[in-house]
Swiss-Prot record:
Name of the molecule in the record: Phosphate acyltransferase
Keyword Transport: no
Annotated family: Belongs to the PlsX family.
Keywords: Cytoplasm, Lipid biosynthesis, Lipid metabolism, Phospholipid biosynthesis, Phospholipid metabolism, Transferase
The protein's annotated pathway: Lipid metabolism; phospholipid metabolism
Gene: plsX
Record carries keyword Lipid metabolism: yes
Amino acid sequence: MSQKVRIALDAMGGDFGASVVVPGAAISLTRHPDSEFLLFGDSALINKQLDLHPALQKVSRVFHTDIAVSMHDKPSQALRRGRKVSSMWLAIEAVKKGEADVAVSAGNTGALMAMARFCLRTLPGIDRPAIAAIWPTIRGDSVVLDLGATIGGDAEHLKALAVMGSAMASVLFDLERPTVGLLNIGVEEIKGGEEIRAAAELLREMNSPQFEFIGFVEGDGIGKGAADVIVSEGFSGNIALKAAEGTARQISEYLKAAMSRTWRSKIGYLFAREAFRSLRDKMDPNKSNGGVFLGLNGVVVKSHGGTSADGFAYAVDVGYDMVRYDLLNKINQTLNRGGGALGGTPTAREAVS
């Protein structure tokens, strides 16, 4: 495929704005030279960074706005103040207008979700979008969702997540019928609240040809790779994500302290440093950065707000991959196959609450 992938960036999003977004885009460009970028934000700050990255500068267009969404803005505040004028909105709107294939932002998650829903709308049959990400496991990678887009959710919502997540896994992992599990406090059918047990019953009744529902998965099953797709409502999913990232950093610090404690451990490290580097790379949260907003009429990727340039580059990579894999069309095909994979699910809400 020779066509360029057009990536819209909220250059003012996150804790560090253009000082991370632009270098991150430059790193991603080295891996995907068929990318081009639309950068939205303060042109003076953006151009200052672009001057340091001439290769990126050649394939970038800058669109000025001095209005940025704060990391502390409530979604309703962000919509009132930033609709049609903020760097976040303009990046998303570029996707709606067909000027970009994907939007990437490290900004406020709630504001980004609200703006994306308001601007792009949801797919038919999808009531609320979800944040999905690739989760490294001991048996490969899994798709995990929802990682914080929506707090709570009824059985129909969890069913929709399973359908979208399975479509994503099918595309990314080349699986004909990925396995799907519901995150729960136990694997027994009697465990969990009413909604999750009702969702399990719906998924069993579906007997979908597009995925295999394997039942409940406990928290430790995520890292074990118990299923190709792990489904959770956003509150529990976000806690699981942050706990895993914190644990990875904790183990890294423990290893660093242990390897520098005595001269013997330092010598041992010299012999085993390649193995430790491999472990560090595998556990680096930056390499799992980039959550995809599933269920929208467009592709939007959320980066961690406090990430580094390397971390933001991985989020841009995710956006690039979603376009190259034609994820949006594949999800649409899955939802529409056989008269609608979500048969009976109400159509999307037209407004953001």
